[in-house]
Swiss-Prot record:
CDD domains: UBA_RuvA_C (cd14332). Coiled coil: none annotated. The gene is ruvA. It is found in: Cytoplasm. Keywords: Cytoplasm, DNA damage, DNA recombination, DNA repair, DNA-binding. It comes from the Bacteria. Transmembrane segments: none annotated. This is Holliday junction branch migration complex subunit RuvA. Belongs to the RuvA family. Residues 1-63 are annotated as: Domain I.
Length: 183
């Protein structure tokens, strides 16, 4: 599995960059924000999400870990694929997007190409609680993703996250949350 690329940017378009790494050129899907920061002929370091489908092997590239985490979370929402997730990241930084979700600005989300009212509402509902505004945020986001990957619902997870002590390590928080969810 490819998780990162360090190489020279060979070619850039709005949503794709070609990165040459030791004689091999990789086509990487990127947001418009990322493509604007890349320069042809310059060295780049991208965090990669590799998606393997029946008909395609895709590489998505990100300059920031926060973009990659948000992209992965968006892909878990039914109706959101790579194209729409990249459109969101092209329109908003992760912090701007977090603010839109926190303030429930459905209309702003609908301005993203490919997102109508129904999908905007679904994204809002699915991401409520994913962004937490306090010092335990990084730990809570990791716990949220771990529990969600185990099949727990967002509402259940959010309820448990509110009860966790802020000083717990991520592993301890996951264990505590699992105990609460299974009782």
């Amino acid at each position: 599995m490819i998780v990162g690329l360090i190489g020279v940017v060979e070619k850039i378009s709005a949503l794709e960059a070609h990165i040459e790494v030791q004689g091999v050129v990789y086509g990487v899907q990127v947001s418009m924000r990322t493509s604007a920061l890349l320069q042809a002929g310059q060295k780049a370091r991208l965090k990669i999400l590799q998606v393997i489908k029946e008909d395609a092997h895709l590489l998505y590239g990100f300059l920031e870990e926060s973009e990659k985490i948000l992209f992965e979370r968006l892909l878990k929402i039914n109706g959101v694929g790579g194209r729409i997730a990249l459109a969101i990241l092209s329109s908003f930084s992760p912090n701007e997007f977090e603010s839109i979700i926190a303030t429930k600005e459905v209309k702003r989300l609908q301005q993203v190409p490919g997102i109508g009212k129904k999908l905007a509402d679904k994204i809002m509902v699915d991401l409520i609680g994913f962004f937490i505004q306090d010092e335990t945020k990084p730990m809570h986001n990791e716990v949220f993703l771990a529990l969600e990957s185990l099949g727990f619902k967002s509402a259940e997870i959010n309820k448990v996250l509110k009860t966790l002590k802020p000083h717990l390590s991520t592993e301890a928080a996951i264990k505590e949350a699992l105990q609460q969810l299974r009782s």
